[in-house]
Amino acid sequence: MNMIQIFGTNKSFDCKAAQRFFKERRLPFQFVDLKEKEMSQGEFESVVAVLSKNLGSRTSAIEALIDPKSKDYSSVAYLDDSDKESKLFENQAKLLIQPVCRNGKTEATVGMAQKIWEGWR
């Protein structure tokens, strides 16, 4: 059985809502506070790969992960795609849309995605 991972910060209401969603359905999950421990390169790659498959391109996946409402958005808005990806990886807590949820290596979501989570076990 896959372990569901929720990446986000404790201050995020959506992260709290995601935790509540999985708790209410008695689905085991691990919450990873991005302020304490950011995604490893492998975890980040896995999320980007799944999103790339669903959205059609790696560029779209990176764009989907970046929060345009973030205070630091201007630091990535005009970068080349490859630079955007490395900047996002280096500043996950500040730039990611939260929560980023992942179910094993095959499923991942950005933001609130209850319809998709319904199918997770």
Regions found by a protein language model. Give the residues of each.
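Thiol/selenol-based redox catalytic cores and closely related redox-interacting motifs
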Residues: 36-121
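Local sequence-structure signature of Cys/Sec-based thiol-disulfide redox active-site neighborhoods
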Residues: 1-37
